Amino acid sequence: MITNEFDTITAIATPLGEGAIGIVRISGSKALAIIKKIFKGKNLDDVPSHTINYGHIVENGAIIDEVMVSVMRAPKTFTREDVIEINTHGGVAVTNEILQLVLRSGARMADPGEFTKRAFLNGRVDLAQAEAVMDLIRAKTDKAMAVAVQQLDGSLSNLINNTRQEILNTLAQVEVNIDYPEYDDVEEMTTALMREKTQEFETLLTNLLKTARRGKILREGLSTAIIGRPNVGKSSLLNNLLREEKAIVTDIEGTTRDVIEEYVNIKGVPLKLIDTAGIRETDDLVEKIGVERSKKALEEADLVLLVLNSAEKLTDQDRTLLEISQNSNRLILLNKTDLPEQIETDQLPEDCIKISVIKNQNIDVIEERINKLFFDNAAIVEKDATYLSNARHISLIEKALKSLQAVNDGLELGMPVDLLQVDMTRTWEILGEITGDAAPDELITQLFSQFCLGK
């Protein structure tokens, strides 16, 4: 469907359901005219911008709800258009009724993410900042929120824009040397100077790329597979980490017949905990499917928590699990330390963590070891640092580095500086896709379609 970018749009901006407040948002040139048709209270033409005004929403003289209406005039709004927010009593019926009234009064239903898209199109935010809005909404921990806020505040955008400007200056210098070789007041872009500039850009982007692992973990969570043979305490460990009972815990082997996924906040790091079915040979078809899914989860995990029974000697199944997980980021947990120890610790390859999920012992040690393994006990989010957390951004930085490598390769082959402009220009264009300066319309539409309705 083709829609007019300048239509006045509306949507419910709060989750549907029972609650104290529901918000119907309107943005566009007709926002004030629409609210005046349905609002009984102060004359909204006379109220200052960025004020909240008491009154009623009415239709044909009948009161629909008692409301507070926020009036925010362009250009000092999120969309840089006139914005009205109707604060209703929360509830499905009343909020939907007011939304339908706004639609009948001349607004169009907003597409998902269209408010933020307008903020981008009107220059209020760039594409990286717009994506940070969604990251902020989806953040599962305070550290993930901090990274999203940094990006929303422009830390990544400023770094990218400054780098693009330096690349542009380099390209301009090459052009001047070509077109006006007689100018003595412009430094000549020699091979040595081009190499120096290229290495400078490579170093900056390489250092930025080094933050991707940490940033991506904070944004998407640390995929953590809990593995072990049946009935060693995997589900109990999951419940202990979650601080609530999510998995069924029994003495019957094979109780967990599928893969259970839950998120938990470990010192600011979101862990996507995957409680796998015990990996063993089985004739039970349903359990067999669960075992296969467990093996797949193990292959894809960022972290493996291997649970062994310290009250029993190592079994063939234990040894198989030790072998198939040896190339993973792994912590070995010896459970049931409240019972006499039987396991052969001298045959285990790493320092193990002795725990008792029944008595909730040493769960905090697991959390500390995870922090050490992935963050070297450093501050998880450093003040004033810039982090890459978005897979799209990471891919573009990698592409930009490949273009810079092509410039270096050309320099090594003795190619003239002016012939290397193509790859340097490509680097500039690729970085522009991060902020949206050089992003195709199809990409922009696709990105905003992933946003919430009303955002």
Curated annotation (Swiss-Prot):
Its cofactor is K(+). It is an enzyme of class 3 (hydrolase). GO terms for cellular component: cytosol. K(+) binds at N231, T250, I252, T255. The keyword Zinc does not apply. Keywords: Cytoplasm, GTP-binding, Hydrolase, Magnesium, Metal-binding, Nucleotide-binding, Potassium, tRNA processing. (6S)-5-formyl-5,6,7,8-tetrahydrofolate binds at R25, E85, R124, K455. It is found in: Cytoplasm. Binds 1 potassium ion per subunit. Its EC number is 3.6.-.-. GO terms for biological process: tRNA methylation; tRNA wobble uridine modification. InterPro entries: G_TrmE (IPR031168), GTP-bd (IPR006073), GTP-bd_TrmE_N (IPR018948), GTPase_MnmE (IPR004520), MnmE_dom2 (IPR027368), MnmE_helical (IPR025867), P-loop_NTPase (IPR027417), Small_GTP-bd (IPR005225). Mg(2+) binds at S235, T256. Residues 221-375 form the TrmE-type G domain. Belongs to the TRAFAC class TrmE-Era-EngA-EngB-Septin-like GTPase superfamily. TrmE GTPase family. Homodimer. Heterotetramer of two MnmE and two MnmG subunits. Exhibits a very high intrinsic GTPase hydrolysis rate. Involved in the addition of a carboxymethylaminomethyl (cmnm) group at the wobble position (U34) of certain tRNAs, forming tRNA-cmnm(5)s(2)U34. This is tRNA modification GTPase MnmE. It comes from Streptococcus mutans serotype c (strain ATCC 700610 / UA159). The lineage of its organism: Bacteria, Bacillati, Bacillota, Bacilli, Lactobacillales. The gene is mnmE.
